[in-house]
Amino acid sequence: MSQIAVRTFHDIRAALLARRELALLDVREEDPFAQAHPLFATNLPLSRLELEIHARVPRRDTPITVYDDGEGLAPVAAQRLLDLGYSDVALLDGGLSGWRNAGGELFRDVNVPSKAFGELVEAERHTPSLAAEEVQALLDARADAVILDARRFDEYQTMSIPGGISVPGAELVLRVAELAPDPRTRVIVNCAGRTRSIIGTQSLLNAGIPNPVAALRNGTIGWTLAGQQLEHGQTRRFGAISQDTRKAAAQRARAVADRAGVERLDLAGLAQWQDEHDRTTYLLDVRTPEEYEAGHLPGSRSTPGGQLVQETDHVASVRGARLVLVDDDGVRANMSASWLAQMGWQVAVLDGLSDADFSERGAWSAPLPRQPRADTIDPTTLADWLGEPGTRVLAFTASANYAKRHIPGAAGVLRSQLKQALERLGTAERYVLTCGSSLLARFAVAEVQALSGKPVFLLDGGTSAWVAAGLPTEDGESLLASPRIDRYRRPYEGTDNPREAMQGYLDWELGLVEQLGRDGTHGFFVI
């Protein structure tokens, strides 16, 4: 293993304050990451490093600092990054404990920069809000009001406010005039907790729509804590809009972006930015996934604007990088960019595009390193092998997916916990690795071979191919060989969270502005 450099808390803090590019990678699984991490740390688990690193940290000489909390994952991740061609890789001195001991502030939960920024917006702009009981009274009185749900459509389908319509955050300014054409209609924006409803409401206010606007205070959590009933399985969505509506919304959005200092680029300017190899530039299409798949700018990534503002660290993992946003009408890109600029990003909107520029079709595919060689078998062969003793199937898939469906007898394993899982499972004569498609499993073949000393095979096409072949599956966690730490249980997701967890989450959000002040590196401003 190479000798790996070390960076200190003070090195990272100085770079953040100077707005120099850096990637601070927490390579633990998501749940331990969510318990405590620095503000601008981004979670990229060792388990999925090869699958995500090239998209999230595209420039190979980006200063990358890796840490864990003493689990031994960081040195492995740092060496793996060097092997993948990254040249400026260091370990955080002392790991998470070193950060804490040096006086660094630690935050819990996920997507904290975005959530803390939302709280700062409300604190500075006094974004109007209504309590759950007030909104229920409006519904009971059949008041002239419309409820717009700013979350992803799948979240909306899980649970929603009665009568609410799914309008993900970046779509609000574009579509509100058709959903509430009478300027006397009250517009209420909700999410699950606080951030997206605050940002959505303030977006409409910043854009100067004539309607009265308010956030549903504390979202579906507040609704539940008030003892009020949610709807489930709803499908109400925004519809088509007129060209006049689109044009008026574009004018409003551009004015907001200009106030926030958003830059402008044409295709020539974009090419110039992309040719500057000492800077990282992300090219992000902020329209709906359906629009992206129907036609997009080559080289762009699909990142719907509302989620980009909410989960910036999941996409742009290099703090200090440049963001270029793309749409086909100037509304969603400008509104999203206005928020990202206030969050301290250098951000530009790509202007002057024609329909012909959106020439590439299909879903976005993550850039990947060269895939390692592996001996493969087909599902029928595996089924035959499982009829005899000695074959152990290891499923390298998300624990939630494993619990829903897996090959009978397969053990659910996290790569970051592989050694412990193999010890727990005992020896086998041979191993067959799988996941949904076998892509992630392919990167684990050499590790299993090194740890077990046994023959290791890859299931061609993964568990999806097994299912497509009509072979049986089972559910449950009886053979989950790694702890369920790959997914942090968010108190605002699902319908069965304890009241104490939901209230605790709201209390935590309300304390974020104070934490931002103690940390002192955020660089946020509010227009």
Residues of each region from the PLM?
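Rhodanese-like catalytic fold shared by cysteine-dependent sulfurtransferases
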Residues: M1-A23, V27-V146, A150-Y282, V286-R392, ...
